[in-house]
């Protein structure tokens, strides 16, 4: 007989602003059995995360108000539980993996200290016993050379590695119920498969229930027993996974299932001139030891990468987290030191100082993965987008800058009337459009796109890809597209480079690499996607 772990009964949640309450979760009912995985899917702003955070009462009250319904764990109410009862449940019986590890990990503490804290608080383990448990868990979530990484701080890890540490932190408590809010968003397909296998194994060992929030439908197919679809705060469809994927009944579910990235890259202009020529690019970070922190060695993270990129062309850079993708992008932007040759539009960049680089900078722009981190929360949209104009076109008046901001907001599909709002007032997809507008306003020739769609749900992802294609065709933009989502790469890129541990495994025309990969690692990535 199955045992109900969690029951959400007719839950409604609202946010109060002065005298009005805006309902963001409306009459939602969900149930999770022991050993079962329920996937919660839907676009950003649909109420998925608010529902999940409500389980452990992690939302600030006020402004949050629980308008109706209840949440029961083993039959006991969590919404009406005392703080002492909740402290006994949080982490011990119900653990949570958050989407953004940079917000969740303490930047001032080493990995070992943060992981030991979990074992000390929740399982009462001493440091000696905890050390082995920590190493084993880090190894299981795919952290290479785990013993050497224990003294690292969060900023010394790649985005995917930070997410794996977050997953390890949640699993160390051996919870009865795991709430996973987009836990594999920042991970490449190989590590993603490894994490999903680990979650399945632990679920079997512990008979653990799991609430898995994601916008990645391929993960839902592989992992979930049942699926609940949310739209505008309501649960519009709920069924077992096989039935829902085979015959969805709600129009919104049908739309979600049909929104996988598709299509071909935009046609290349003829003739297409070479815009970027990179030869033997190498990046190494110093290893410092001792009291005086002397350099004793170097960690080579990018090893002799060479490629050319033409005007109007997209080059995809794919590979597992920690493979050197983002480091390559930072080296091309001259934001970190590197060796080798970087020639942009006939101009060598490697030996230019900061002043000499300034006239070129507006022609090479970047859009980062997480607009929450890359957009200043204290500036409104007008101030964010016009910031580059203040640096590169200082003679423009405030009115001229505002006119350019209005024009570029139209171009990226944003309402210019919202230009005086702040980033927190926009959805994830809208924030990424703001980031694209900030890059586009300087009329660049090359945009480095570092995982620009990985944190977006499928419907919004498709809209951003369509936008990027139309902008590329209109302005003859070249893109360096960094991604672990091979479906997106296939739809956008003309050329592709596959990286592993800083080295080029395979490169060539995207159509050829996807149709007939030459290397085993590339074949593995494609098989897992």
Give residue ranges: language-model regions.
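Conserved ABC transporter NBD signature motif
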Residues: 66-77, 340-349, 360
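ABC ATPase NBD coupling module
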Residues: 64, 78-95, 113, 121, ...
